[in-house]
């Protein structure tokens, strides 16, 4: 009888261990999931960084996703050209060729009914003719100074590629997808796996109206990647045309790094759009954002100054920041940085659980 009890106990013990193992595996699976929060003010390049993460995992887009992106490419091209030509009167500009007024009229008619799978060739022709007008190109080059809204930094790329994009069999290539301008509204979650570790990345709408929706929801994230656009030091907000965009980005960064929700959270700062900044700093003085700056007006010194300004915003002297200068559209550069950042996050957060 005692022997039978002993065998029963053994069986019970084995079952108990099996259940414990299963529970532990479920817990381990959750622990192995790294949660990242992508933050930054509007137009900073968050969506592009998220696309780069997807490229890092070699995750292919579905046919349905590509079709959606193609439609968005068409829409962006037409709408952004419409914004450009409508800004001409306020800028005191006229077309080089009066015939372009006809193209504007036809484009306006097309916009009223844009339910097309592909670009209509005549619509593409009108956009192409407008883009070839020197005055339109001049207006595009000066769009930031004139505060013309909703014109992306990569719009020129799509205008230049109109002959390819307007073809009946057009499918967005990797560059199209990466440079495609998309606005994040609300919270977008993307999941993927790198180095046998599952990631959940949350991209949050950057405009002021979006920010109150999320801050209390993400206290358990493993790290925050905060993105600030270097090139915005002489620009103002879309929502408030008196507020400098760099200063607004710094205010948001300050509120995040000093938030009680993220007191112990790693923060990685991407100073993005370095390529645009490098060109702009040659012509536009950084004093527009930082009148106290006394250094040389060159890339190295101004970026170093901006870094110190961001780092000084933290009230926690023990908090470590990882700062990278990035060009989110430069796949090779960003992929190397993301690989380094992801490795750091894995080691920093999962090593604590004894898994690595």
UniProtKB/Swiss-Prot annotation:
Keyword GTP-binding in annotation: yes
Coiled coil: none
Chain intervals for the UniProt region annotation (G1 motif): 35-48
Residues with lipidation of kind N-myristoyl glycine: 2
SUPFAM superfamilies linked to this entry: P-loop containing nucleoside triphosphate hydrolases, Transducin (alpha subunit), insertion domain
Lipidation (S-palmitoyl cysteine): 4
Protein name (record): Guanine nucleotide-binding protein alpha-2 subunit
Gene expressing this chain: gpa-2
